[in-house]
Amino acid sequence: PAIVANPQDREARSEALYGAWLCGVCLGSVGMALHHKLCHVIGGAFDLPHADTHTVILPYAMAYNAKAAPHADAAIARTLGGRDGTSALIELAGRLGSPRSLKSLGMPESGIDRAADLAVQNPYWNPRPIERT
């Protein structure tokens, strides 16, 4: 991304700010799904950093929902220039040096079952059904 290549690029920074604003508008206009639910459950229960938790969880939630939301996945793939939205987002995170695992954020492996239990306690809208298996 241009802002990574040149952090002083005012146009790139302006476009990033506008994109962030659009994301906020979307959050106020749509139902939250699996990604947001998992981030709040995991971040809150294990005291993980908010933005980094979103960065790690998003590709996995997208992969889970891709079959139920193929148009959204295709739009993300087109925007990021990948074969599918999930892999394109993972590649972008890698190029940016973003965290790639919950372990790197401090989540213990022993917390996975607890996180799964918490995530299914209060049903959330999601394009694909969520079940604890």
What are these regions (language model features)?
Residues 79-133:
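C-terminal charged capping/lid subdomain of soluble metabolic enzymes
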